């Protein structure tokens, strides 16, 4: 017997993709594979019908029904980067139902949500005064792109605010944390 939740499956899949990208790219998008001279088709039907789908896992038990964790990566128009969405569909009545419901969720997510880049990796986001340093100020930024997912059309209303630690006293190391980012939509 084994038990899990949709949330845990999504966390596990997110870590799989992030921590083992070379294995993910090599194995999870294959439409079939051969082992011990036996050809096995991938039961993830979305791989055959949606070129943006690149995995992940099908399953079936009498208790859980037909299940599918699907991943899709699509370009963000005009943004210069792509976005990945995951779906976890559990308890459907058939293989085709799990594919249909997963595709609906992916299409809904891509059609109704946008990713906004608040800050670009390694670019100064702000400058702050520094005490007892050779320089009078320090530039603050982020070690990675800061991306936020919001409802379509609300991207212009998203704002980031860096709440810095006070006071900033030298010496400050590169990549040292000097504050907290607060993200607000309509001042909430």
PLM feature spans:
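Domain-terminus/edge residues, biased toward the C-terminal soluble/receptor-binding domains
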Residues: 2-3, 7-188
């Amino acid at each position: 017997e084994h038990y899990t939740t949709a949330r845990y499956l999504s966390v596990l899949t997110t870590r799989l993709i992030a921590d083992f990208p070379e294995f993910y790219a090599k194995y999870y998008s294959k439409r079939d594979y051969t082992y011990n001279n036996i050809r096995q088709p991938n039961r993830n039907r979305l791989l055959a019908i949606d070129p943006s789908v690149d995995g992940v896992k099908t399953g079936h038990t009498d208790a859980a029904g037909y299940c599918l964790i699907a991943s899709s990566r699509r370009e963000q128009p005009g943004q210069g980067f792509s976005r990945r969405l995951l779906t976890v569909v559990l308890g459907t009545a058939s293989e085709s139902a799990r594919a249909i419901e997963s595709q609906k969720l992916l299409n809904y997510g891509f059609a109704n949500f946008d990713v906004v880049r608040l800050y670009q990796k390694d670019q100064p986001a702000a400058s702050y005064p520094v005490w007892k340093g050779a320089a009078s100020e320090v530039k603050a930024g982020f070690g990675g792109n800061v991306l936020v997912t919001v409802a379509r059309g609300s991207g212009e209303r998203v704002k980031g605010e860096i709440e810095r630690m006070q006071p900033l006293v030298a010496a400050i190391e590169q990549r040292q944390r000097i504050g907290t980012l607060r993200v607000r939509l309509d001042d909430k």
